[in-house]
A protein has these predicted regions:
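Conserved NTPase motor "head" modules and their coupling/switch loops across ABC/AAA+ ATPases, GTPases
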Residues: 87-219, 228-232, 236-247, 256-258
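Nucleotide-state sensing region of NTPase/ATPase domains
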Residues: 1-47, 53-63, 119, 156-160
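An accessory alpha-helical subdomain
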Residues: 33, 39-126, 142
Length: 259
């Protein structure tokens, strides 16, 4: 059996050989649009980081190692802070800084290309005709600390605050994608429908980056395509699919495509 559960663990085989999840993702790359994705703009920073990271996992072979190493080191540093092991913290700062800086480079690069593809799709679909906010929204990548300082400097400068709070308060684990309209958080301004179309466009833009920059033919999977979308946004999504030059798989409870 290619997929089975043994002792509570999922075991996956490819050509009769056990493979890791990372290997499977690269053999059968895919991106997903589902109900939670429709709330991308209004979701937590953690959700937006995960959505970005999932695409980078597919695109960059070294990202997985960098990601896991950073978060293991971060956990170790936070443990030292909780136990007041001050003398050991400086040793871990350097390693956390190296891994965190590299992780940040991966994210910023993928974000930049996603933003380019997002703007391309907005112009292509002329969505501003009925979603005027596209002409005023500004999208920024916040790396999790002040851009004017290195991550190592931030770790050193925040040492007393970290010790007081027993956790690392700045770094890639605090990064986010921020959306502003006239310097105001866009979530305070956009309607539910506007947030949905924004989220759909952003997800499709990430998908296009995989093809255009990395030449990865990822499958786009759209779950329950109609449930969260009104007819106007649904029609925009269908137009978008014409510009996705990969396989698309979707589920739909309603019979939306009968001729």
């Amino acid at each position: 059996k290619p997929i089975k559960i043994k002792n509570g663990y999922l075991i996956i085989k490819l050509n009769n050989k056990r493979v890791t999840t990372n290997k499977l993702i690269r053999e059968f790359p895919c991106t997903l649009i589902h109900n939670n994705t429709f709330s991308f703009a209004n979701a937590s920073p953690d959700f937006r980081r995960k959505l970005l990271d999932r695409s980078i996992f597919i695109a960059e072979n070294n990202f997985s190692k960098t990601w896991f190493t950073f978060y293991r080191t971060l956990k170790q540093r936070n443990t030292l802070l909780k136990n007041n092991r001050i003398s050991d913290i400086y040793t871990w700062n350097k390693k956390l800084s190296n891994d965190g800086t590299l992780l940040n480079i991966f994210r910023k690069d993928f974000f930049k290309h996603t933003l380019d593809e997002f703007n391309f799709l907005v112009d292509l679909l002329n969505t501003s005709d009925f979603f005027a906010f596209f002409g005023t929204i500004k999208i920024h990548f916040y790396q999790g600390w002040n851009d004017d300082c290195s991550f190592l400097d931030i770790l050193s400068n925040n040492y007393k605050k970290d010790l007081l709070r027993k956790t690392t308060i700045a770094g890639p684990h605090k990064s986010d994608i921020k959306f502003l309209i006239n310097n105001i958080d866009a979530r305070q301004i956009l309607s539910r429908g506007e947030q949905k179309i924004f989220s759909v466009l952003w997800s499709c833009a990430q998908h296009r980056v995989l093809k255009k920059k990395y030449n990865i033919d990822a499958t786009l999977i759209i779950d329950d395509v109609k449930s969260e979308l009104d007819d106007r946004i649904f029609n925009v999504l269908i137009d978008l699919l014409n510009h996705i030059n990969n396989q698309v798989i979707f589920s739909c409870i309603d019979d939306c495509f009968s001729s």
